Swiss-Prot record:
This is Uncharacterized protein ORF102. The lineage of its organism: Viruses, Adnaviria, Zilligvirae, Taleaviricota, Tokiviricetes.
Length: 102
C-alpha cells in the first residue's frame, strides 16, 4: 500500500483480500475467478447483492463483475474519496482533506 499526502494506492490483491475477510465475517464466502466475483453462503440469503446487480442462480450463490463488486464495497467511501481502480490497484483520493498530515 502506498500512502501519499492525499491518496492511498492499494494493490488489487490486497484490496480484495481485505474485502473478502469483511464479507466472510458476515457469513458470505467470496472468490475471484477471472474478472468475476463469486459469492456463496450456507446461511445468509444474498438477495441484497442481487438488488445491487449480482447475477444469482439461487438465494445462496451469486456472481458479479469485479467492477460492480468494487462499486458496491466502496460506495460509502465515495462522499470522502474519489475511488479509481484498474486491474492492478485501487486508488482512493481524498476529497478536500488530506489523509496524512505531516
Amino acid at each position: 500500500m502506498i500512502v501519499d499526502k492525499n491518496k492511498i494506492v492499494i494493490p488489487m490483491s490486497e484490496f480484495l483480500d481485505s474485502m473478502f475477510l469483511v464479507i466472510e465475517k458476515l457469513g458470505v464466502h467470496a472468490e475471484k475467478k477471472g474478472s468475476m466475483i463469486f459469492l456463496s453462503s450456507e446461511r445468509v440469503k444474498l438477495a441484497d447483492w442481487k438488488q445491487l446487480g449480482a447475477m444469482c442462480s439461487d438465494c445462496y450463490h451469486c456472481k458479479l463483475p469485479l467492477s460492480s463488486f468494487i462499486e458496491i464495497v466502496t460506495r460509502k467511501a465515495k462522499d470522502k474519496f474519489l475511488v479509481m481502480y484498474n486491474e492492478k490497484e485501487v486508488t482512493l483520493v481524498a476529497r478536500g482533506v488530506q489523509t496524512i498530515q505531516k
